[in-house]
Amino acid sequence: MANEVCFRTLDRSDAPWKIDEYRKFGGYKMLEKILREKTPPAEIIEQVKVSNLRGRGGAGFNTARKWRSCKAAPGNRRFVLCNGDEGDPGAFMDRSIMEGNPHAVLEGMIIGA
């Protein structure tokens, strides 16, 4: 399944905003591993490339390619943004993850940072 990681804890809890609920299903384990092992950013990007993770927009942009270009950008200050805009009427693809699995979004953002 292409989105197994994104959706494995979606709607498995009555209180998805609670960190303990997310952790019950293995949430934040990957972040803890990356921090504990001091995984270099290039290795994280390579793992994302191998996973073929893609953006949820219409173009399905390759996430590793995006992260690689951000890492190579000049300057010392960088920011991580989460674009949850759904411009199409009735579109709820981002909203469903942000409401049903908000900690997965946060964990991904932290890893990407």
Sequence positions of predicted segments:
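Feature of Fe-S/electron-transfer and energy-metabolism proteins
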Residues: 1-113
